[in-house]
Structures are given as structure tokens and as C-alpha cells.
A protein has these predicted regions:
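Rhodanese-like catalytic fold shared by cysteine-dependent sulfurtransferases
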Residues: 1-59, 67-109, 117-159
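Active-site flanking residues adjacent to catalytic metal/cofactor-binding acidic residues
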Residues: 62
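Short, surface-exposed ligand- or partner-binding patches at beta-edge/loop junctions that are enriched
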Residues: 112
Length: 159
């Protein structure tokens, strides 16, 4: 298997196996693009128009971008600002560090990053916690703003 590609145990193809690492019990690696694709396979990713409609029906937008990025790009009015490094702790309805909006596993969380890559990984992680309706915004904040949906300058209020 030296230098050959293989399929990892979860069925994801394209995993790079170098120097017979998998055969020897070593690490099997995937590219970040493969990780994002695997995450997205389990998500129902709304475009900005559909996300807006879902928000009017009770879905919650969660902006995970760092403060500096939100300062440059702006933010979505009404979105909860929860930086990525604490997201799972804030949204786990069984956790002691949850926010008040994290009432149960059935909340429709729509995670937003800048362009919709980091948010896909974050939404997949939320689903692993049992937040089965969690997803992310296809195209991220950039697509939201390009669609002419509401944005504003930053209000530094982190949760």
C-alpha cells in the first residue's frame, strides 16, 4: 500500500494513505476538502433566501466568525454571536454552559461563517451532539449579504 490511496473505514473515498500507514496501524489522513464534503453530506444547507424564511419561522442563526472578521464584514441582525471555540458548549441543551435558547435537541440552528466552509464542519459537530436539525448557511455571510438580506455593522456582543 506504499503511497496508495485507500478508503477509510467510514466509506469516505480519496483518503491518502502514505507509506503503508493504515496497514501498519498508523494514521489515515484526509484533506480538509474531504472533511468538508463529508460534513456537508449530512446537512440540509439552505441558501440565503431559504435561511431567511426559516428564521422567520423560528430557526436561529448562529454567527461563529471571529470578532475581527465580523468587524470587517458586518453581521446579521438577530443572529446569535457564538465564536467557534465555544459553540458546542453553548448549544448543547444538556450542558451547564448552554445559552437560554438551547432548549432542546430539536432547535433549528443555522450556523454562519464567512463563506460556508467552517460552518459546515461546525454544523456537523452539532449534529454529532444530537442537534439533529443543525445545518449551515450555503455560501455563508458573503452569500447572505450578496442576496441583499439584512446586515449591519458589528455590535461586539459575544455569548
Amino acid at each position: 500500500m506504499d503511497g496508495a490511496a485507500a478508503t477509510v473505514a467510514d466509506g469516505t473515498d480519496g483518503a491518502a494513505v502514505t507509506d503503508g500507514a493504515a496497514a501498519a496501524g498508523g494514521p489515515v489522513t484526509r484533506t480538509v476538502d474531504q472533511l468538508v464534503a463529508a460534513a456537508r453530506a449530512g446537512l440540509d444547507r439552505p441558501d440565503p433566501a431559504r435561511a431567511w424564511a426559516e428564521v422567520t419561522d423560528g430557526a436561529r442563526l448562529v454567527d461563529i466568525r471571529p470578532a475581527a472578521q465580523r468587524a470587517r464584514e458586518g453581521e446579521i441582525p438577530g443572529a446569535l454571536v457564538i465564536e467557534r471555540n465555544v459553540l458546542e458548549w453553548r448549544l448543547d441543551p444538556t450542558g451547564s454552559h448552554r445559552i437560554p435558547e438551547a432548549v432542546d435537541h430539536g432547535v433549528r440552528w443555522i450556523v454562519v461563517c464567512s463563506e460556508g466552509y467552517a460552518s459546515s464542519l461546525a454544523a456537523a459537530s452539532l449534529q454529532e451532539l444530537g442537534l439533529y436539525r443543525a445545518t449551515d448557511l450555503d455560501g455563508g455571510f458573503v452569500a447572505w449579504a450578496a442576496a441583499g438580506l439584512p446586515t449591519r455593522s458589528v455590535d461586539q456582543g459575544l455569548r
